[in-house]
Structures are given as structure tokens and as C-alpha cells.
């Protein structure tokens, strides 16, 4: 139904091709992290946690091509931050916190022009997220991953367009190990996690 409604707004002739663009969007996001915890007694616990959120983003890019095929090259920023806090199982109960902020993505998306005003695309992206680790564990400064997605771009007038997209980002495995400092987290404690993000996004863009 969304597809049909958006198609009704289009009235330009392949106007989104061969243009630099700027866009802003909002996403419904679901985050899942599978991992395990190896405590000071060498007991291993496995599990998964999940959370949902609504985020905003903005980006710049360039669409090029003509006829049936095209290509979209872009860079997107998702500002904001989130903090995770954990308490060690050691006798000290030392707190460890992890702050995630400012996700960026570079992407390439081959496009198939279905009509004069609408394109379908497949996207592959390279993601990086800043991390700030506080506590007696090894410090990891970034979290990297890759995105695969499918979406549509619908021309709306002569300069505007609407983008809809669904996809997932799989991040590299994170491993945190205690440093064993005084009143800190023992070196025998270790946590690993592999975060995955699933999302749906709608954006409005302007073509220069």
C-alpha cells in the first residue's frame, strides 16, 4: 500500500538520475547481540539481548546512469549515542560501560529503473561506529560492519524524491577481557558479542 501511495506522488521523468543529492530520514531499528560470558570461575554463559529504537539520519550522495541501469554512491551519518553498563562478577563488582555513538556508512547501490519515475536498488555498505569503553577492560574504539539492503527511490516533483529501504547490518565480533588491575576486572573474565541491526527506513531527499 505504501508503494502505491508513493507512486501516486511521482510526476517527473527519471529526474533523480545524474544528480548530487542530500537527504534526511528516520528508521525503525532492531538490535540483537549474540554472545557469551566467561567468568572468573571459567563458567561460560551464552545468550542474546535485543532492543528497538527510532533513529534519524542524514546523508549526501550521487546518482548516475541512464536508460535501464544506474548507480547510487553515498555517505550517511546517524548521530546520537547509547550507553550500556555492566557489573563484573568479581568480588570488586567493578563497573564497565560502553558508549556507542555516531554511526557512519559509505555505500554503493546498483539501480534498476522500473519506470521513468521509480527505481529499485540493492545496496552494500561499509559501516563504522565510535565506541568509548570505560572500566578495567581492553579498550575498543570502533565497531565495524557491513550492510545489505533493498530499496526504492521515487521521484516527487522536479527536485524531491522519497526513498524506502529495508536491510541489516552485521558487525564484527567484539571481545572484552579484564585487565586485572587492583580492584578491577580479573584477566580471567571475558565477554564476546556479535551485534546485528535490522532496520526499515524512509527518507526524503533533494536533488541539486
What are the residue ranges of the model-derived segments?
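Gram-negative bacterial Sec-dependent N-terminal signal peptides
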Residues: 1-14
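Gram-negative outer-membrane beta-barrel domains
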Residues: 12-208
